[in-house]
């Protein structure tokens, strides 16, 4: 499974991504409530309500609790790493969602995902 972060969706909305489309067709994409919220704060494609409804209908990643996220930050020394609450939540969710990789276009988030062994490389698929 692949958890696509907000940057992947925004890029796809601007220009269709064939890798994302193939993963969607094969039911291999997970979504996360915080990604949907971030997209809702922006300008998802029209019709807006239909796009958000579609995203909510995708398989959802397991969501780490605030306590789990705090423990995850300390265990992996993610403090002062340049990432925020959504980023660490996506990292933690990728780890607790079985066989899940995180796909991001955010260089800092990808840098943090690599040593955790959860970075998705679309060029390999």
Predicted regions and their residues:
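Short, well-structured N-terminal submotif of metal-dependent ribonuclease cores
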Residues: 1-31, 40-52, 59
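Short, acidic/turn-prone active-site loops that include or flank metal/cofactor-
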Residues: 14, 33-36, 57, 108, ...
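Active-site neighborhoods of divalent-metal-dependent phosphate/nucleic-acid chemistry enzymes
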Residues: 12, 18, 61-123
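Short, structurally constrained coil/turn elements
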Residues: 23-25, 54, 96, 114
